[in-house]
Amino acid sequence: FFYQPANRGILQPIIPLGVQIENRWYLVKAYVDSGADYSVFKPEIAREAELNYRAGRRTNLQVGNGVLMPVYLHNLEIQLGRERFTCPIGFSHRLGVSFNVLGKQGIFDRFKICFLESQGIISFES
């Protein structure tokens, strides 16, 4: 995957992936974050899919400034490249960044991930 422009046009490790919600697939772009325990998406995706995201398992994640952010976890099928698998995806109305976050749980234990910053490439090897 090639890095994508984010805030102010700066290239970041943002990748496309498919997420299945209620038997329908959605294309989502997410920032690959090796410091995030869980994947956390903005709730607009859940609302579009008519998923009551607050029905998920609630947990609180500590963000960079020490504040606890409520996250509602759902086990969803995703497609990353050619691989399809189920992993925990959280939704939070308090996500304080402008992009979805792809975290470690269910992702980093499945792939060898290489960030090639100088070339703007991120690779996933299963």
Predicted regions and their residues:
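Pepsin/retropepsin-fold aspartyl endopeptidases
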Residues: 1-126
